[in-house]
Every structure is written in structure tokens, then in C-alpha cells.
């Protein structure tokens, strides 16, 4: 029998290996809202969390219980009370909160403990621990309204948490915490997840929502937001009366976490199977990241970037789209190159060759990774090269191309005669390639 060759699996694994190495030993805080726990895909999410643990990632899982608490209140005909969009937890509500949280604690612990069953890692033991790692205090009275047993974090026992994580345990935290006087308080899962991520200096905080992430006006996923942009989204939703959706609650915490040193916060769908793995082990992810600095950067190339540039341009050279460059030539001309990198992978490049006497420059070796050719990376490179040319005192920019004539024309370049090229460039013109010459004024 001939076995089926699964090339997609091979390619996917090759691309995921750098992320496996990067994530190993790092601390991730995962925030699971009650809505995610109720969804039919929750078992798959738990299995993926178990897989992350098996890869050496230190995990803190924080679960919420909002819909479960509301269901308990409804079943006992107890009206939920809110003040300024915060739940007022009276004595009766607290008992129902503890009931919901306790049930979820046992259920999630059991699921995590068996998450590696029916896998090659079956038999590997996952130790799940919970405890009084958080000390709570009451919210108190606001505008004459007593929040009763609704609370906030007073302090976190970071040392105890680190000891558990270093021992290889998954830490599971729920919405109920005790005070120094032994009273129980109801806390929000987003506050717990956010403060744990900050105090533990977590690499990532990950949250789940019903959609694939934050969307723009066209309904497309926004792959990256800075904290000020995320804050604006929160305020816009609050103006519409949305204070407690999973997306808003997570973004609120993500803004605070990023500004306090957590490098990346990820918002993904709890409805999509494998979303957690796709987000963490692929270059572009599948949801929305909130970051202090972009995962993507544009900069001048250095000698260390030669390997990445060669890997990017070789296929285009083999197709005859680009003129072939040897490694030695690239080493000598590396200072002329600008690259776009994403997660340390070169995804686009271009070079500027100035001709100072004629006050003209050539934009050459323009290449964009196939995965990003429908994006704006080409325009970004063109803008950067044009800016460099103007800073160098050049007044015109030209390109030689056999395939991208219309692309450059759409961006202000016009076809010109070969005679308008700088004299030294004209002498090197390859009449066999018959490249078109296009030129633009830099203004």
C-alpha cells in the first residue's frame, strides 16, 4: 500500500519549529471566559493547552464563570445586581458564584488531566494546581452602593506561583479569592489574568472571544493593534453600551498588560478548532495581537541579513524576474538594501543604487514573499526607498522591470527611453532581457 504524502503537514511543521524553540520555558497566561467553556469546541481547546504544556511552556489558566453564574441566579430566581457595570455580589450571589466556580474548577482540572489521552503522549502526567495565590480585598462602597463580596486583588504570591510553574504544573485560577480575614470575594477573570501576566512577567496573555479577533469596518481581521488603538476600540464599544463582552473585557486587560511589560496579548476565537495553535505557531497567526512594538519592522539590511535576502530572491532569480546576484555581490552591496522582517523572517526587500552626479537613483531587487504579495509591503518599500533617495539629494527614481510595469505605473512611474539612464547604467543595460525603464520624479 502506498502511503499518502502530506506535504502540507511537513511544511507546517517546518514553519512551526522556530516558534516551538522560542516559546519553550516562557510563561503564558490563558484567559478562558465562561462562554468559551460552554462552547462545544472547549474540549479541543483543553487538548491544545495540554499540548502547549508538553512543549515546555509554563501555563497559568484563568477561567471566568459569568454565564454560569447568571444561569445559577436565574435558576434560583435571584435578580443579578450591577452598579457601574460591575456585579454586586451579595451573600446569596456569593454562594451561587462559589458553586459555579467550584464546579468549573473540578471540570477543567479533570479535562486538563486527561488532555493528552488518545495522543502519542498518553500516560504523561499533567499536574494541575490551584490555591490561595491571590489575596483579595473588597471593592467597598461607591456612590452609596455597597459592592458586598465583589472584590479586587490586594496582592499576589508570585514566589509560590513561580515554584509551581518551575515544577512543571499548570496553575488553574478561578474568580473567587479570599481576603486576609478569611472572607471570600468575587473577582473578574480579566483582572486576575492581567495582574498575573504582569506580576509573573509573562511573555503572552491569551484570550478567547466569539469572533476571530478584532475586525475593521469591512469585517476583516485586524492582525495587530497598539495599546492606544485597542483602548480606542474599547471606548467605542462602551459608547454603544458594550461593557462586558469577551472582546471588550480582554482588550481592557490587554492594554494594561502591554503597558506594564507583557510583550504580546492575543485575542482568538473559541469557536475555531486549533485557533490557539495557529496563533502561536505560525508567522501571521489567526487572531488579533495587542503589542507595544510591531512584530514587523522595516530597516536597513546588515551583513547578518544576507541569508534571508538570498532565500527571498532566489526563486525570483530562477524565474528570470530578478537579475541573479551572487552572495559575494550581495555582501558588497548590503548597505544599499532595505528589508521588512516579521518575526525574524525577511518577507520583503529592495535596494537603492544612487547616481549622485545625475541626481538619480535606481530602485532594484524588489522582492516580496509570496504570502504577502497581496498586501501593501511593496508600497511600504517604495515609500522608504523614495524617502532615502530624497534624503540623499536625488530628484528622480528609476526601475528596470520585465514583469511589474503596470504596478510601477500605478504608483507614478512613467516609461522612458534608455537614453535617460545614467551613463554608467546605460553601458550595463542588458539588451537581451529588454527590461522596461520607468522613472518617477521625487518632488
From Swiss-Prot:
GO molecular function annotation: L-glutamate N-acetyltransferase activity
Main localization category: cytoplasm
Involved pathway(s): Amino-acid biosynthesis; L-arginine biosynthesis; N(2)-acetyl-L-ornithine from L-glutamate: step 1/4
Alphabetically ordered keywords of this record: Acyltransferase, Amino-acid biosynthesis, Arginine biosynthesis, Cytoplasm, Transferase
Transferase in keyword set: yes
Cellular localization per UniProt: Cytoplasm
Any matching Pfam family: Acetyltransf_1
Enzyme class: transferase
SUPFAM superfamilies (alphabetical): Acyl-CoA N-acyltransferases (Nat) (SSF55729), Carbamate kinase-like (SSF53633)
Any one of the GO BP annotations: L-arginine biosynthetic process
Catalytic activity: L-glutamate + acetyl-CoA = N-acetyl-L-glutamate + CoA + H(+)
EC number: 2.3.1.1
One GO cellular component term: cytoplasm
Ranges where the N-acetyltransferase domain occurs: 296-443
Annotated control of activity: Feedback inhibition by L-arginine.
The protein's assembly and partners: Homohexamer.
Family the entry assigns: Belongs to the acetyltransferase family. ArgA subfamily.
HAMAP family listed in its UniProt record: N_acetyl_glu_synth
Entry protein name: Amino-acid acetyltransferase
Source organism (scientific name): Shigella flexneri
Gene giving rise to this polypeptide: argA
